[in-house]
Design a protein with these regions (language model features):
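Mid-chain, well-packed structural core segment of small domains
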Residues: 59-95
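Non-catalytic interface/targeting segments
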Residues: 1-53, 57, 85, 91-125
Length: 125
């Protein structure tokens, strides 16, 4: 089964790019299509401008693109709950220096589920 994985990234995106450590403030998303533990395709998607409540806009954008999992180093509680509502699994990849390192850790089953303990507390809860 194919899975589309999104990773908040610094420009220009891609597997060699530095991970964007806060999902809502990243430059771009790297989208990685995976099947049977192998990377099939890598592409990028722009992050919409961050405005009031702006962390929820990318959730919808990524859901509409067919994303099923997201790696993140940080995010607020509201977007985490929104990802749960749209059926996107979120994994904590705070120690990954690059997108590729995060993806490899995900493929190896080394990343924990992103839970409330990892959230930052900016904005309304």
């Amino acid at each position: 089964m194919k899975t589309l994985l999104a990773v908040p990234s610094c420009l220009p995106g891609g597997l060699d790019a530095e991970m964007g450590m806060h999902f809502g403030h990243c430059d771009i998303y790297t989208l990685v299509e995976i099947e049977d533990g192998k990377i099939l395709n890598v592409s990028t998607m722009d992050n919409p401008p961050h405005q009031q409540g702006g962390c929820l806009a990318p959730v919808q954008l990524l859901a509409q693109a067919g994303v099923k999992a997201l790696l993140a180093g940080g995010m607020g509680f509201r977007p985490l709950m929104a990802f749960h509502q749209v059926g996107i699994d979120v994994f904590f990849a705070g120690g990954a220096p690059t997108v590729g390192a995060g993806v490899n850790a995900y493929l190896a089953g080394q990343l924990p589920q992103f839970t409330e303990e990892y959230t930052c507390h900016g904005g309304a809860q």
